[in-house]
Amino acid sequence: MRTKNEKSPLKAFMKQRRMGLNDFIQKIATNSSYACKHSEVQSILNISPPQEPELLNENSSPPPSPSQQINLGPSSNPHAKPSDFQFLKIIGKGSFGKVLLARHNADEKFYAVKVLQKKAILKKKEEKHIMSERNVLLKNVKHPFLVGLHFSFQTTSRLYFILDYINGGELFYHLQRERCFLEPRARFYAAEIASALGYLHSLNIVYRDLKPENILLDSQGHIILTDFGLCKENIEPNGTTSTFCGTPEYLAPEVLHKQPYDRTVDWWCLGAVLYEMLYGLPPFYSRNTAEMYDNILNKPLQLKPNITNSARNLLEGLLQKDRTKRIGAKNDFMEIKNHMFFSPINWDDLINKKITPPFNPNVSGPSDLQHFDPEFTEEPVPNSIGQSPDSILITASIKEAAEAFMGFSYAPPMESYL
């Protein structure tokens, strides 16, 4: 009787045939002058580019073949690929991948690189949200409190966002450590957040996912909003949308009611975050999600007396259950900006970062990871993330992934490159 470790002659023969077939298909896939030009071979491999016009738009580009590098700028610039970077540490995780601290080999600058698995995105049918995130990131470059995208590219299996590296820690981390903030500190953060939201609204973008985990502090202590996967584009000032999305603790009543909602949903979330900064928990929090939803819909807002009248008035206006009566419903950001709670704020100085932040994260440099969770930073970086394979076996799933993210890659103009 054969043991489990013994291989039958038939198995050895089949393995040899499979290896030979893989080599043959790789040659076909990576050599445009090879038999791939034959229509029957194309049909069998199913790697012809899609012809449906609805899959393309004026900004789209064909999906890259496995041997094709992504051009990040004019022809004088190098093509982007994972091996252009040294991936140093994992600094965050999400549903579809990881965020890593990386150093660019050419200029030795540090970036946060968001690496997403295409298969995971397609499995959950989230490709539209990922492309929306990329589109919003492209518009962020002109605002100081929004994370910036330097460029993006893709391999056959992954998407790469090359982002500003922000290492002052999540607002969530600092709230957990300190429990709550004094009113001047909460006001400063709320003002910078409101400024960022107002800018997004001016571009007809609704953020929809404001929460302490998506609010970062930079190395000086200024606010930076990140994670734009739930943003909704093309929402005019009086426009609405109806997708049920967000984080339970911060959902507005109209979202829970599954009613059409508008940009005032972001002002509700600002109220929830401001409340949490002042009191230590979201306004209608319960460990029981169903009870928390009922609280959001029906429970009156309860404010303890340890805040000023202006803070109380602002929270009551932001956490108004009727969105048509909510502060910001008429004149959006201008209503928030002109509220008496923010009277100590010089908004021109704020936007120009001339106001000294109330808290300094005291980071010594890019390699200072004290404000990141050790659960992430102590995990080994997978070697595959930084590899740029010269060729890869094309499968139907890889072809589907390439088509789903056409137009993802982005390079800035030459003068702003890196």
Swiss-Prot record:
Starting at the broadest rank, the lineage of the source organism is: Eukaryota, Metazoa, Chordata, Craniata, Vertebrata
Query: Where mainly located?
Result: cytoplasm
What protein name does the entry list?
Serine/threonine-protein kinase Sgk1
Q: What are the transmembrane regions? A: none
- The chain positions of domain AGC-kinase C-terminal read 343-418
Name of one Pfam family that matches = Pkinase
Could you tell me which residue ranges the Protein kinase domain spans? 85-342
Annotated region Disordered: where? 50-78
| UniProt xrefs under PANTHER family | RIBOSOMAL PROTEIN S6 KINASE
Among InterPro entries, the record links this protein to: AGC-kinase_C (IPR000961), Kinase-like_dom_sf (IPR011009), Pkinase_C (IPR017892), Prot_kinase_dom (IPR000719), Protein_kinase_ATP_BS (IPR017441), Ser/Thr_kinase_AS (IPR008271)
Q: Which UniProt keywords apply?
A: Apoptosis, ATP-binding, Cytoplasm, Endoplasmic reticulum, Kinase, Nucleotide-binding, Nucleus, Phosphoprotein, Serine/threonine-protein kinase, Stress response, Transferase
Give the family per the record: Belongs to the protein kinase superfamily. AGC Ser/Thr protein kinase family.
Which reactions is this enzyme annotated as catalysing? Answer: L-seryl-[protein] + ATP = O-phospho-L-seryl-[protein] + ADP + H(+); L-threonyl-[protein] + ATP = O-phospho-L-threonyl-[protein] + ADP + H(+)
> A GO BP term, please?
apoptotic process
Species source reads Xenopus tropicalis (Western clawed frog)
Location(s), subcellular: Cytoplasm; Nucleus; Endoplasmic reticulum
Top-level EC class: transferase
Give any GO molecular function from the UniProt entry: ATP binding
Where do Polar residues bias regions lie?
68-78
This protein's record includes keyword Cytoplasm: yes
Positions annotated to bind ATP: I91, G92, K93, G94, S95, F96, G97, K98, V99, K114
**Gene for this chain:** sgk1
- Gene3D superfamilies registered for this protein in UniProt: Phosphorylase Kinase, domain 1 (3.30.200.20), Transferase(Phosphotransferase) domain 1 (1.10.510.10)
